[in-house]
Every structure is written in structure tokens, then in C-alpha cells.
Amino acid sequence: MGKTRGMGAGRKLKQLRITQRWADKHYKKSNRGNEWKKPFACSSHAKGIVLEKIGIEAKQPNSAIRKCARVQLIKNGKKIAAFVPNDGCLNYIEENDEVLIAGFGRKGHAVGDIPGVRFKVVKVSGVSLLALFKEKKEKPRS
């Protein structure tokens, strides 16, 4: 049984197209309304307060402790784990610091061997973490 043909079939064809759209993965993701329930709620970055510094064990076959921070977002109070990139950058982050968090690749999925971590730290107290790491800037005294 194919699609309806004929001069009066417009409404039926339109209705069929609307129902079939929901079979498309990308359409479903953008129109279901779940984006607002995610921690960032449709934005690329978010500010948060560092609750604690944590080490997350890497998945097999790797063996390492990935340095992360537990962060509570200011906009909605949700608590997330954020990866701290580069060697020794965890030393620039203290508890109760304000950090800027961004996504970590893969469209909301965990990256590499770090289980359950979907975000990374970009700035600490308004200063880029990369600038602190390269010693181009200093962290402001609070």
C-alpha cells in the first residue's frame, strides 16, 4: 500500500508526513523538548561553583585517575562532574571557586575513557585555564 494520490489527497499526505517525521532521529531529538531538562538547558556554556575536587578512574584497558571537579551550576542548581584538562591544572582550582563549564565533545555523551563526564572546565574566576597553565595570566586574589 503506497501513499495516497489524487487531487483531494493533500491533507492526508500532510498528516502522514507529520507522523513519519517522528521516525527521524534528529527531528525527534530537536523537537521532543528534552533539551530544557539537561544541565545546560540549551546553552553552550554555564557558570558554576566548585564543590569538591575528585578523581575518576579511567575505563578499561586504561589505568589512570582523571582529575575532575564536582560543580553546582548557578542557573539551576544541578550538580555535574567536569573534567579539568592539562597536566596540573587541578592545582589552579580551589573549592568555592567560580568556574565556566563547556561541553566536552560527542554531543552530550561521555568522551574517551572517562565514564559519565560530559563537561570540561574552561575558565576559573574569570581567567582562562589555558592562560593559567601557560603562566600568561595569574588567578585574581579573592
Swiss-Prot record:
Pfam family, one: Ribosom_S12_S23
Keyword Ribosomal protein: yes
Superkingdom of the source species: Eukaryota
Family per record: Belongs to the universal ribosomal protein uS12 family.
Alphabetic keyword roster: Hydroxylation, Ribonucleoprotein, Ribosomal protein
GO biological process annotation, one example: translation
GO molecular function, one term: mRNA binding
InterPro entries the record matches: NA-bd_OB-fold, Ribosomal_uS12, Ribosomal_uS12_euk/arc
Keyword Ribosomal protein carried by entry: yes
Modified residues (Hydroxyproline): P61
Protein's name according to its UniProt entry: Small ribosomal subunit protein uS12z
Originating gene: RPS23A
